[in-house]
């Protein structure tokens, strides 16, 4: 069994806050409280050092702007997953507006930007968007279905700080049931390419009632075999295209917590649960260029305003976690 290929150091983003210096991890989406000896901005740190730092939920920081955001610059996708968070009726802005939003985020105090979709690897200008964000000091990740990752991994390796690949099952039968024939093999090929090019890589899996109990352990074992950094299990959010599945497929946060507490594996791969409660208040910039924010219970998402200036990112309630 292959264990995670962990580089001596990787890139995080740090800045001072009223609660002390904080460090955002672009791979896991977690935020940590750090000592004052760290520099602000993009910093190289070891996983061991960061793992030893206490986690702090963004809501506890009472910041003026989100610690991290998800930016979905496009709706287009080569797959049609029934549990997708995105709303396919949202219009897409043109390329110049995507550049404008990238520059706005780069000028803000947001520490982490996760570029999602749709399928972000369909964007030809993705490397340029990443470069703009990195130049502004953000830690940048890309969340992808992985089917185009093998051909784009080399170009991403010199730019992006982390990739998160969505898998819905530990094998082709279970994954392809949700994402279509052949999608598992292409996603795994993408994971292998990302790992081979030295990109910090993790698997993300949405917990679904019909599959969770049989899939959690083999998913962690697959992650170990592929040499990724970790697995994050995400509580299903009843928003976007996936809202119609909520009644049948949602687990409660207590059920999800108990499920992972009972996980029995010898793998050293780190495992994390992102609960629905933790996602309450999380900020998303959708393809229409509007700032959207999860409701406090993360059972719905609201459009707040167009993102025209940094002030439009302002928090009016608790921040949420990726």
Give the predicted meaning of each segment:
Residues 1-7, 12, 166, 176-283, ...:
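Radical SAM enzyme [4Fe-4S]-AdoMet core and its adjacent flexible, acidic
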Residues 1-88, 277-295, 310-319:
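N-terminal pre-core extensions flanking Radical SAM catalytic domains
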Residues 25, 45-141, 147-151:
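Conserved alpha-helical substructure of the radical SAM core
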Residues 29-34, 44-47, 74-75, 124-126, ...:
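A broad, low-specificity signal for short, low-complexity segments enriched in glycine/proline
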Residues 34-42, 67-72, 95-98, 116-122, ...:
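Short low-complexity stretches enriched in small and charged residues
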Residues 82-83, 173, 302:
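Short small-residue beta-strand/loop micro-motif enriched in glycine and branched aliphatics
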Residues 98-115, 123-234:
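Radical SAM/AdoMet-radical enzyme domain recognition
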Residues 101-104, 307, 316:
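Generic alpha-helical secondary-structure signal
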